[in-house]
């Protein structure tokens, strides 16, 4: 946290704290969310201003209950943050919007510096790990982001039972859709109700993945046990 703060970076989660999905790796509350707060974009923008941030990461819960998946508030939040904070750089870590390209396009048109969407795990493990998500649909999200000319970013966790070959294949899949920023971190079990850790991956293996990522053409690769999606986010702009 101190490292992020010293870099003038912080992460905000919008659209509430209750998710409509129940991924087996995530500690976010699940259930029926409260109505969306239409004043949230202004509140986030003011918070960024008061904290004198240089770079902000915005993420959200999944809002499959909303007709637009929360896309309008997503886009307005980006616009408001830029309006009140000239010179700020913004990364958005978005859900898949159920595969709705129009909803994703609203976020794209708000023009953040980076749009991130995490695969979270390899293709084989996706049904076990990610509630309602689809590996190929996530790749299509990233393809649409990259095709717009914005920087596309994704990340996975390891230690869930994947193989080295599957991790390398995932990198290849991401490069095929022109994703050029990639993060890898160790999965840690949030509670006994979540998926158990299958393996604590050795730091040497993380370094091997980092080198492989650059060899495959990623412009930025963060690969260490404690790396999370927003780690060193300000350096990816």
Model-derived regions: residue spans:
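N-terminal [4Fe-4S]-dependent radical SAM core
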Residues: 1-35, 55, 229-237
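Auxiliary Fe-S-binding modules of radical SAM enzymes
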Residues: 1-8, 42, 46, 52, ...
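Glycine/Thr-rich phosphate-binding loops of Rossmann-like dinucleotide-binding domains
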Residues: 22, 66, 125, 192, ...
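Small/polar loops that bind or transfer phosphate-bearing groups
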Residues: 14-15, 92, 223
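Core AdoMet radical
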Residues: 11, 27-43, 50-101, 107-141, ...
């Amino acid at each position: 946290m101190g490292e992020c703060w010293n870099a003038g970076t912080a992460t905000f989660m919008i659209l509430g704290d209750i998710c409509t999905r129940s991924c087996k790796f995530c500690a976010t509350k699940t259930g029926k969310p409260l109505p969306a707060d239409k004043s949230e974009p202004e509140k986030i923008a003011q918070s960024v201003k008061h904290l004198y941030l240089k770079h902000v990461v915005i993420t959200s819960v999944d809002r499959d209950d909303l007709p637009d998946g929360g896309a309008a508030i997503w886009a307005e939040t980006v616009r408001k943050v830029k309006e009140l904070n000239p010179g700020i750089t913004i990364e958005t870590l978005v859900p898949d919007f159920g595969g709705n390209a129009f909803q994703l396009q609203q976020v794209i048109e708000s023009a953040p510096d980076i749009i991130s969407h995490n695969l979270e795990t390899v293709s084989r493990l996706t049904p076990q790990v990610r509630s309602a998500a689809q590996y190929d649909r996530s790749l299509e999200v990233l393809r649409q982001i990259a095709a717009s000319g914005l920087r596309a970013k994704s990340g996975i966790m390891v230690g869930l039972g994947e193989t080295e070959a599957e991790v390398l294949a995932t990198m290849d899949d991401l490069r095929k859709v022109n994703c050029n920023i990639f993060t890898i971190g160790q999965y840690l079990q949030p509670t006994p109700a979540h998926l158990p850790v299958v393996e604590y991956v050795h730091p040497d293996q993380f370094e091997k993945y980092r080198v492989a990522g650059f060899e495959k053409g990623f412009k930025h690769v963060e690969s260490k046990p404690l790396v999370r999606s927003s780690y060193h986010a300000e350096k990816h702009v």
